Regions:
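Structured domain cores in non-transmembrane regions
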Residues: 66-110, 114
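Short loop/turn segments at secondary-structure transitions that flank enzyme active sites
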Residues: 61, 117, 135
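C-type cytochrome heme c attachment motif
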Residues: 46-58, 97, 107-116, 128-131
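Extracytoplasmic/lumenal ectodomains and periplasmic regions of secretory and membrane proteins
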Residues: 125-155
């Protein structure tokens, strides 16, 4: 019983610490009508593959799941696969984690489950991502020249 109580107290302390360390920015509400806007979803997939997937993997997502937003296997092959990837493979990067750490100071995280992991009392995971993507700003003090209000010192 004492171990259970100690574990509970430890968990509560950790949760409150994690809560305190969370974003102090008020999250914008993600416009829910965008979830049914197929063209916007397909454009987002293209932007993710062209820009984010160069450093960030989405290792728990397969390219063929993009059929869920109306893309065909042929469209995926023609527009989203650039090397030897196959439609049924997971979205991984060829970036060596050791090189990434050296170049960026940290290995870019896998983005597959960010929406689920960032849901909180402040908003949904979609709200977090929406706000995060909208709050980048120029910051000449950062190595990349950019910073973010939701995720300070990212990149």
């Amino acid at each position: 019983m004492k171990k259970l109580f100690a574990s509970l107290i430890t968990a509560l302390v950790m949760i409150s610490g994690a809560h305190a360390a969370g974003a102090s920015v008020t999250l914008d509400k993600f416009p829910k009508e965008r979830l049914t806007n197929v063209a916007a979803l397909q454009n987002g997939a293209k932007l993710f593959v062209n820009y984010c997937l160069n450093c960030h993997s989405a290792a728990f997502m397969r390219y063929n799941r993009l059929k869920d937003i109306g893309l065909t296997d042929e469209q995926i092959k023609q527009n989203l696969l650039f090397a030897t990837e196959k439609v049924g493979e997971t979205m991984v990067v060829s970036l060596n984690p050791k090189d990434a750490k050296e170049w960026f100071g940290a290995t870019p995280p896998d983005l597959t489950l960010v929406a689920r992991s960032r849901a909180s009392h402040s908003g949904t995971g979609a709200d977090y991502l929406y706000t995060c993507m909208r709050t980048f700003y120029r910051d000449d003090t950062r190595p990349t020249g950019w910073n973010n209000l939701v995720f300070p010192n990212v990149g």
